[in-house]
Amino acid sequence: MITVDVDLGDRAYPIHIGSGLLSKAELFAPHIRGARAVIVTNETVAPLYAAKVEEAIRSLGKAVDTVVLPDGESFKKWDTLNRIFDALLTAGADRKTTLIALGGGVIGDMTGFAAACYMRGVPFIQVPTTLLSQVDSSVGGKTGINHPLGKNMIGAFHQPQAVLADIDTLRTLPARELAAGMAEVIKHGAIADADYFAWIEQNIRGLNDCDTDLMTEAVRGSVRIKAAVVAQDERETGLRATLNFGHTFGHAIEAGLGYGEWLHGEAVGCGMVMAADLSHRLGFIDIDTRNRITALTCAADLPTVAPALGVDRFIELMRVDKKAEAGEIKFVLLRKLGQAFVTTVPDADLRATLLHAVLRPPTEAPVA
């Protein structure tokens, strides 16, 4: 087992990475201080893993309840969140009750938000079961739900007590879900570590096949980068915003198509291709770097051509973004591979990238 620590002073917490973690009661024990835990999971994950976690918690002498929610991004909303609150109140959960998020990013985000809100804050543990949630969304304390007008617009920062990333759970992922998680792995290399990006390029075939050793290293490499960023900028006032590389375009794709039509990682993958094109168009990266990002995204079985939402609709959707200020859209771009920054961009260049992303094969030279 590998452990990466998120250094937030008295709110620091461990990220444990390895195989067979769901059954290890000793990993849960330090973080469940009350008499009860409530597992929040979904209809897909519950039959696979809920019993293992329940058994581990009961072996500690704790009561455990399990809330099973519908599966999918389209359920990341108020109605579903209220089902968690209903279950907590019905079970008599108190301020020492620990919530356990057992599932992917949707479950993690909603469980964390419920933990932030219930009785003004209760502890929770992240047990991510998808690649995307293991390498990204389970780390850093961002929680929330979607609104019809924008993704993740309602939420809170609420750090977990611990993250248990069991690599074994990735073996049951559909290929499409595994690919979606690779988008965030690629993102971390692109924004923070060119050597890590090159390692992903060299090992993409084995990663696509979910090789255990390679996947363990990918999760470790990504959470190492994210943990370092979160430790420096927990509330996303500066550096942490660079973790949104590809997300401004990606969130617009998700909202424009309807949540759930594309997986989040698929939209981020395409968004990274678009952000790389915009970075090149503005003179920050060369054509080879842009094409490396596009080629690796494609090799990870992610979409590289954007849906035809229309340029004006894309721009309208991107204005509803947490990074936007006074209606001005901000983008995470690359100065070079491994170095990202946040900026505004000229409207003409943005429109050119949007047209290019839909109409041109992504490896062609940009349209002037």
Curated annotation (Swiss-Prot):
| Protein name in the entry | 3-dehydroquinate synthase
Swiss-Prot/TrEMBL cofactor(s): Co(2+); Zn(2+); NAD(+)
Pfam family membership, one: DHQS_C
Matching InterPro entries: Dehydroquinate_synthase, DHQ_synth_AroB, DHQ_synth_fam, DHQS/DOIS_N, DHQS_C
Q: Name one GO cellular component term.
A: cytoplasm
* Assigned EC number: 4.2.3.4
Q: Which residues are noted in the entry as Zn(2+)-binding?
A: E184, H247, H264
| Subcellular localization | Cytoplasm
Any one GO biological process: aromatic amino acid family biosynthetic process
Name the Gene Ontology molecular function terms of this record.
3-dehydroquinate synthase activity; metal ion binding; nucleotide binding
Q: What does this protein do?
A: Catalyzes the conversion of 3-deoxy-D-arabino-heptulosonate 7-phosphate (DAHP) to dehydroquinate (DHQ).
Q: Which reaction equations make up its catalytic activity?
A: 7-phospho-2-dehydro-3-deoxy-D-arabino-heptonate = 3-dehydroquinate + phosphate
Keyword entries, A-Z = Amino-acid biosynthesis, Aromatic amino acid biosynthesis, Cobalt, Cytoplasm, Lyase, Metal-binding, NAD, Nucleotide-binding, Zinc
Coiled-coil ranges per UniProt: none
Q: What is the lineage of its organism?
A: Bacteria, Pseudomonadati, Pseudomonadota, Betaproteobacteria, Burkholderiales
Native source organism of the sequence: Ralstonia pickettii (strain 12J)
- Part of which pathway? Metabolic intermediate biosynthesis; chorismate biosynthesis; chorismate from D-erythrose 4-phosphate and phosphoenolpyruvate: step 2/7
